C-alpha cells in the first residue's frame, strides 16, 4: 500500500487521464527527480498499476539515483534510459514528463518540455505562484497542444473550489496544521514550539510558498483552482506532538460555502 498521499494523487492523475477516454496506444513518460517520490512512481509501474504507461527515461542530478530506478525497470524487462541532461530526456520525445524534483527544476524545464510536445505532471506546484511564469506555462501549453496536470497533493475538491470561484465574488482561506518537527530547518522554527501551540504564518499563498518553498505546494494548487495565489489567505499552525498534516480549504461566495478538510498521517 502507498502511504504518501501526494503520490497516491499523482498515480491517480495518470489513471483518470486515460480511463476517461478510449485507449489508442501506450503512452510514454519520463521522470525528473529520482528521490523517494520518483521511486514510488516507478514502483507503481513495476506492480502493474500503470499498464498503459511505459517509463522510458529518468534524470537526476545524482546519477546513482537515476540508475537505481532504471535498474528496477530492467528487472521487469523494460528499457529505461538514464539521461545526464534534461535535453537528453526530452530527446526521447515522451508523451508526459513527471516532475518530482523541486519548484526550481519545474521553472527550468517546463517551457522546453511543453514546446517539445510533452505534457507535464508536477508535484512542485509552488513554482506556479508566480503569475508571469504561470501565464507563460499556460500560453506555451496551448500553443503546443500540451497540458500541465497539477496533482492536488494532500487535499482535494478542486472541482468544488473552481465552481465556487467561477460563480463570482468568492473569498478563500487555507489552514494547515503541522507538528513542530515538520518545521525544523525553516525560518519560523523555535524550540518553544515543542511545548506550545503557535500560529507561525499568516499571509497569502505567494508569501507562504516563498517562506516555505517545499512545505506548502498544496496552498498554491488550491489557489490556482479557486481565487488565485494573491487572494488565497493562508494560516499555518504548529501543534506540539502533532503527526502528519491537516489541510483545510474554505471558500465562500454569495450563494455557496464549501469546506474541504483532509488529514494525512504522512506529512
Annotated model-derived regions:
Residues 99, 122, 148-152:
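General beta-strand structural signal in soluble alpha/beta enzymes
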Residues 116-118, 144-146:
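A short helix->loop->beta-strand "cap" motif at the edges of active sites that frequently abuts
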Residues 125-145:
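Rossmann-fold NAD(P)-binding glycine/threonine-rich loop
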Residues 63-92:
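Conserved N-terminal Rossmann-fold NAD(P) cofactor-binding segment
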Residues 32, 40, 149, 154-267:
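Active-site-lining helix/loop region of Rossmann-like oxidoreductase modules
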Residues 23-74:
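N-terminal Rossmann-like dinucleotide-binding module
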Residues 84-115, 127-130:
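Beta-loop-alpha module in the N-terminal Rossmann-like domain of NAD(P)-dependent dehydrogenases
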Amino acid at each position: 500500500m502507498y502511504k504518501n498521499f501526494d503520490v497516491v494523487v499523482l498515480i491517480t492523475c495518470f489513471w483518470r487521464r486515460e480511463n476517461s477516454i478510449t485507449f489508442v496506444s501506450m503512452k510514454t513518460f519520463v521522470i525528473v527527480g529520482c528521490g523517494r517520490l520518483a521511486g514510488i512512481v516507478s514502483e507503481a509501474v513495476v506492480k502493474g498499476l500503470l499498464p498503459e504507461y511505459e517509463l522510458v527515461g529518468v534524470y537526476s542530478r545524482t546519477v546513482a539515483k537515476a540508475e537505481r530506478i532504471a535498474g528496477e525497470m530492467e528487472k521487469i524487462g523494460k528499457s529505461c534510459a538514464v539521461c545526464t541532461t534534461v535535453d537528453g530526456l526530452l530527446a526521447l520525445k515522451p508523451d508526459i514528463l513527471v516532475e518530482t524534483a523541486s519548484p526550481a527544476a519545474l521553472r527550468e524545464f517546463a517551457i522546453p518540455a511543453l514546446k517539445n510536445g510533452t505534457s507535464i505532471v508536477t508535484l512542485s506546484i509552488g513554482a506556479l505562484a508566480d503569475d508571469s511564469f504561470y501565464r507563460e506555462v499556460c500560453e506555451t501549453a496551448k500553443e503546443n497542444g500540451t497540458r500541465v496536470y497539477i496533482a492536488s497533493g494532500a487535499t482535494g475538491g478542486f472541482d468544488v473550489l473552481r465552481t465556487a470561484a467561477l460563480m463570482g465574488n468568492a473569498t478563500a482561506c487555507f489552514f494547515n496544521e503541522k507538528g513542530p518537527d515538520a518545521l525544523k530547518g525553516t525560518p519560523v522554527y523555535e524550540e518553544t514550539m515543542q511545548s506550545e501551540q503557535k500560529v507561525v504564518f499568516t499571509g497569502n499563498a505567494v508569501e507562504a510558498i516563498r517562506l516555505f518553498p517545499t512545505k506548502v505546494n498544496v496552498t498554491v494548487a488550491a489557489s490556482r483552482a479557486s481565487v488565485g495565489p494573491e487572494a488565497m489567505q493562508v494560516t499555518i499552525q504548529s501543534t506540539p506532538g502533532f503527526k502528519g498534516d491537516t489541510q483545510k480549504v474554505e471558500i465562500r461566495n454569495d450563494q455557496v460555502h464549501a469546506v474541504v478538510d483532509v488529514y494525512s498521517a504522512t506529512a
